Design a protein with these regions (language model features):
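A conserved beta-strand-loop-helix scaffold within acyl/acetyltransferase catalytic domains
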Residues: 2-49, 53-67, 110-118, 126-261
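Flexible glycine-rich active-site/ligand-binding loops centered on an Asp-His dyad
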Residues: 73
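Aromatic (often tryptophan-rich) hydrophobic motifs at membrane interfaces
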Residues: 88-97, 213-217, 222-330
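A structural signal for short, well-ordered beta-strand segments and their strand-loop junctions
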Residues: 104-109, 181-183, 283-285
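Short, high-confidence coil segments that cap the C-terminus of an alpha-helix
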Residues: 40, 100-103, 278-281
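A gly/proline- and charged-residue-enriched helix-loop-helix capping module
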Residues: 78-130
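Active-site/acyl-donor-binding loops of N-acyltransferases
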Residues: 59-60, 124-153, 282-354
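The substrate-binding groove and active-site-proximal loops of carbohydrate-active enzymes
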Residues: 76-82, 260, 264
């Protein structure tokens, strides 16, 4: 039997998600606050002892013009992946919410490696189908990431596992006078400017400054803005990271077109990894890379940069969709892909030269 999380049971829910090995910041109520255009709900299932043993947070948003909604359980569920009965009850709760909100699909992208074919088969038995896509960044969340196991390791042990050139670049940045500070919202404008520069340089759409400022507000102590400064105090790179449960995630990164020879990005990564060590985390997650690791892929440089820190290349099972209205699903999914590509082209044209 499932239950919907209420204001009264929210602290218990948050404690469960934070402590579970499959816990993820995207399943937190705090992340729901970061997405005010979405309706946030959470479903829980309790064991015989009365404690929560499984949960699924879903966000629902209206699709303009069709009177239906998209339901999305980002990086859910949070439960024992072998517990079919618990997942079945969580899905019952999601279906009830989908009926209430007139959702045309229930979409999930679990924190589950692609090698777990048993879980994929279980999802398929419930009617989920794999969302086909490319190997780059076509999905909502990255399917391919690098993850570094930091559990029980010292900084010296982690450094020893880095590629020697990466260790050299970290020390070079320090020798050249690069400093990294944890900053507040006063540095958001500078970070957003660096994000815009990076987006135009690398060909992706970036967020507005308000989004990053709200992240620091909504996630509080769970979020950090790291800024790197050159020897005269000019901001030359920055990152946004999230610590939740036993993981730290590298969420956003940006850098100037100048002073790249000072290697600020290497030092920024090391500072975030140190945060994971300081907070006794199990995993430092570098987040997305391309699944196409051929050297002629324009995204290969990003892959190589993250690979050099000694993490494990991880492929998730990807987006899984439970289609509730096939005709609307086809129309929306096709239209969304076309719109995203058009928006990207317009954005890059408008910001070229800024």
């Amino acid at each position: 039997m499932y239950e919907l999380i209420t204001e009264k049971t929210l602290p218990e829910y948050e404690a469960f998600v934070q402590s579970h090995p499959k816990g993820n910041f995207a399943q937190s109520y705090l992340w729901g606050k970061q997405k005010p255009m979405w309706q946030w709900d959470a479903i829980a299932v309790r064991g015989e002892d009365g404690k929560i043993k499984g949960s699924l947070a879903v966000m629902t948003r209206k699709v303009p013009g069709i009177g239906r909604t998209l339901m999305y359980g980002c990086r859910g569920p949070v439960c024992d992946l072998d517990d079919r009965e618990t997942f079945s009850q969580l899905l019952d709760g999601a279906k009830a919410l989908a009926k209430k909100y007139k959702s045309y699909v229930i979409k999930i992208d679990p924190d589950v490696p692609s090698g777990n074919t048993a879980f994929s088969s279980m999802l398929q038995s419930f009617g989920f189908k794999t969302k086909e896509g490319g190997k780059n960044f076509e999905a909502i969340q990255p399917r391919y990431v690098f993850r570094l196991n930091v559990e029980g390791k010292t900084e010296e042990e982690l450094l020893a596992n880095f590629h020697q050139k990466w260790r050299y670049n970290i020390r070079l940045a320090e020798r050249k006078g690069v400093t990294v500070r944890i900053c507040g919202k006063e540095m958001i404008p500078a970070f957003a400017d660096l994000m815009l520069t990076t987006g135009v340089r690398d060909g992706f759409v970036t967020r507005k400054p308000e989004y990053f400022a709200n992240m620091l507000d909504n996630l509080g102590e769970h979020a950090r803005l790291y800024m790197a400064f050159d020897p005269v105090g000019t901001p030359i790179a920055g990152t946004l990271a999230i610590h939740y449960g036993d993981k730290v995630w590298y969420l956003y990164g940006a850098s100037s077109n100048e002073h790249r020879n000072l290697m600020p990005n290497y030092l920024l990564q090391w500072r975030m990894i140190q945060w994971a060590v300081e907070t006794n985390c199990r995993i430092y997650d570098f987040r997305g890379v391309s699944g196409d690791v051929s050297e002629d892929n324009p995204l290969y440089g990003l892959f190589r940069f993250k690979q050099g820190f000694g993490g494990d290349f991880t492929e998730f099972i990807g987006e899984m969709d439970l289609v509730l209205s096939p005709a609307i699903y086809f129309a929306v999914e096709h239209g969304t892909s076309v719109f995203k590509e058009l928006r990207k082209k317009v954005y890059l044209i408008r910001n070229r030269g800024k």
